[in-house]
Curated annotation (Swiss-Prot):
Secreted subtilisin-like serine protease with keratinolytic activity that contributes to pathogenicity. Residues 1-20 form the signal peptide. Residues 376-396 are annotated as: Disordered. It comes from Trichophyton equinum (Horse ringworm fungus). It comes from the Eukaryota. This is Subtilisin-like protease 5. Residues 37-113 form the Inhibitor I9 domain. The gene is SUB5. Keywords: Glycoprotein, Hydrolase, Protease, Secreted, Serine protease, Signal, Virulence, Zymogen. The active site is at D156 (charge relay system), H187 (charge relay system), S342 (charge relay system). GO terms for molecular function: serine-type endopeptidase activity. It is an enzyme of class 3 (hydrolase). Residues 376-389 have a biased composition (Polar residues).
Length: 396
């Protein structure tokens, strides 16, 4: 490997409130009932106030019907001990009126709920099959939700968003390092493919957001990395996705209090953050952002459940994940094999996205969930280092 400048990618081969009116959002692309909404009243709404509110809504619907305007009105009413509300079909003006009532807690689109089935991918890349089988195996076993409705921010060298692996689920977010909206090293595309690719990915239905902070040499200033984190938080917040987002940084350098602090803010905001431990076979406590205690710091394992010879170690490491000879997407189409803790971290990001979709956990609780599901199988993990290997909880 070449020497570090400020930053090097760690590779060994080349629903929230969206406005003051309390209208909640659903992930873009989610299937919803056309013009269908669910309205929930505040906890302290009395039965009398709720009845008055429903009379008011009925009058609005009646007036619109008299004027020949479309709108089916209230379809179902909910009146439980601690939940009063209703659902129905309403136009935009009516929803604005409803959301401005001080007795209303929130309004949300009426999303479609589907059955979940188990899918098995045969002859999968070894990293995928390993994380879904406690004792190893050749198949990748996963729930069909597969990260649906979750966004993955890839803070890296860029992503080939047109690659067929992403099936139109990848978008360009921001470029904070140069004026080339492309992946000059192939690193970011490979990482994104592991997180959300249709063949090589874990969360096969997640959306990828490319945040470029590394140049064509795989380097970038710490200030640019911090800017990338800041942009990602603001973007996720704007779209109501903070608790349904994962952020992966397969990069690192010398210790930086500023970078660690910025990384911690993403987690406090509600996101899951995975970072690579580093490739120097040293204690990762001296590196950033790997040394930030609140992130999920990932070391690299081999096909035989051993510590990869290059992988950093130490108490900052939260989990091991596959990081040796990992096959994933390459810019321009096709695939390539890479090794490094850069390849391990996106496995964790992918499983986090998968669990956020499958179990409904918030992003900033996902690292704890990953550790709860993990298996103590890594041989010779290093001094003061966990032996726990990433697992998706498939039951196999």
């Amino acid at each position: 490997m070449t020497g570090f400048f400020t930053f090097l990618s760690f590779s060994l081969a080349a629903l929230s409130v969206t406005n003051a009116a309390h209208i909640l959002s659903v992930p873009k692309g989610a299937e919803v009932v056309p013009n269908g909404y669910i309205v929930v009243m505040k906890d302290d709404t009395s039965q009398q106030d709720f009845s008055s509110h429903r009379v008011w809504i009925s009058s609005i619907h009646h007036n619109k019907t008299r004027r020949g305007l479309d709108g089916a009105g209230v379809k179902q009413t909910y009146d439980f001990d601690h939940l009063r509300g209703y659902s129905g079909i309403f136009d935009e003006d009516t929803i604005k009126d409803i959301s401005n009532d001080p007795k209303v807690a929130f309004v949300e689109p009426d999303a479609i709920i589907s059955q979940h089935v188990v899918v098995q991918q045969r002859k999968a890349p070894w990293g995928l099959s390993r994380l879904s089988n406690r004792r190893g195996g050749r198949n990748y076993v996963f729930d069909s939700s597969a990260g649906s409705g979750v966004w993955a921010y890839v803070v890296d060298s860029g992503v080939d968003i047109r690659h067929s692996e992403f099936q139109g689920r990848a978008v360009w977010g921001s470029n904070l390092v140069d004026n080339k909206n492309s992946d000059g090293t192939g690193h970011g595309t490979h990482v994104a493919g592991t997180i959300a690719g249709k063949t090589y990915g874990i969360a096969k239905k997640a959306k990828v957001v490319a945040v470029k902070v590394l140049n064509s040499e795989g380097k970038g200033p710490t200030s640019g990395i911090i800017a990338g984190i800041n942009w990602s938080i603001r973007h996720a917040r704007k779209h109501g996705m903070l608790h349904k987002s994962v952020l992966n940084m397969s990069l690192g350098g010398t210790y930086s209090a500023g970078l660690n602090h910025a990384t911690a803010q993403a987690i406090k905001a509600g996101m899951f953050v995975s970072v690579s431990a580093g490739n120097d076979n040293i204690n990762s406590n001296g590196n950033s952002p790997a040394s930030e205690r609140s992130v999920c710091t990932i070391a690299a394992s081999t096909e035989n459940d051993g510590k990869a010879s290059f992988s950093n170690w130490g108490p900052a490491v939260d989990l091991y994940a596959p990081g040796h000879n990992i096959l994933s997407a390459r810019p321009g189409g096709g695939s390539q094999t890479m090794s490094g803790t850069s390849m391990a971290a996106p496995h964790a990001a992918g499983v986090a996205a998968y669990l956020i979709a499958k179990e409904g956990i918030p992003g900033n609780r996902a690292c704890l969930r990953l550790k709860q599901l993990s298996q103590p199988t890594i041989r010779n993990p290093g001094p003061d280092t966990t032996s726990r290997l990433l697992y998706n909880g498939s039951g196999r």
